[in-house]
Amino acid sequence: MLNDRARILLKTLVERYISEGEPVGSRTLSKHAGLDLSPASIRNIMSDLEEMGFVASPHTSAGRVPTPRGYRFFVDTLLTVRPLDQVSVNHLENSLAASDPQRLMTAASTLLSDLSQFAGLVMTPRRNPAFRQIEFLTLSDKRVLLIIVTMEGEVENRVIVTEQSYSAAALTEAANYFNQNFAGHSFDHVRSKLRDELGRMRDDITRLMAAAVDAGTQALDASQDNVVVSGSRKLLDVEELSSNMRSLRRLFDAFEKKTGLLQLLDQSRSAAGVQIFIGGESELLPLDECSLVTAPYSVDGVVVGTLGVVGPTRMAYERVVPIVDVTAKILSSALSQHK
């Protein structure tokens, strides 16, 4: 698509713009590109790049800036990623030593933000939706506590408001039935199987089990997915983002609600390594003026979540990419040791 001279000039323009934040003119390109070209030849090539949509000319400047298409070509074809310096690697390894998983998620998010100086994101691991054991306890006349032990050994509680009171024996009978027949399965699986079973059971037990399935599903779904966000306020220091308060509000709203971020990070789980979304590629409106660099992390080789950095499209990709990549690998190692 582009000849060698055009590639070198585009690479130089993107690197200078990322470094300086100002539109890049032909004189700067002539100085830094290392090509024996006249200013007129450089202007002609830049005009061609503009026609192809790789660069654009701001109205207030004679220089040019990269477009999202220009950034994409740069990232896919021209980017030279630098290894993460050993000081940063050591800091990551020391900070992400085997620990409680939730603490590791928070630490990883903070480290991503500190090292990149942008916002760090970590999608918490997908929990196994199955349960190991359940138990019913009477709270009052028509209130029953459902206790769920997950396959990871974590405990979730939900209060069920019943239409009638239940004896301790009835609650034990219902719990035993659940545990003997469905331990190791999800509540969705239980729901599908119970359709056939409930017709052979007493109505009072039927109602209790149906209520337990609904409550259990809600309990595990509520704690299923989350995104830990750190350092979002650092984006206030990015001029091209802070100058548009409307876009900035949308971005911070996305950080708070997290639903769109979850969907985007979830899509990245299947990526083989680092993935970069530039501007509108994320299809998430609040990120239209941002780039998102993500990588999946795993436990014993099984992908369980995604982490990443959100920053401006004018970010130092050659530095952010290894930060995200190395953090994902070190977090994977720490989680595998902790399990």
From Swiss-Prot:
HAMAP family: HrcA (MF_00081). GO terms for biological process: negative regulation of DNA-templated transcription. It comes from the Bacteria. This is Heat-inducible transcription repressor HrcA. Belongs to the HrcA family. Negative regulator of class I heat shock genes (grpE-dnaK-dnaJ and groELS operons). Prevents heat-shock induction of these operons. GO terms for molecular function: DNA binding. InterPro entries: GAF-like_dom_sf, HrcA, HrcA_C, WH-like_DNA-bd_sf, WH_DNA-bd_sf. Keywords: Repressor, Stress response, Transcription, Transcription regulation.
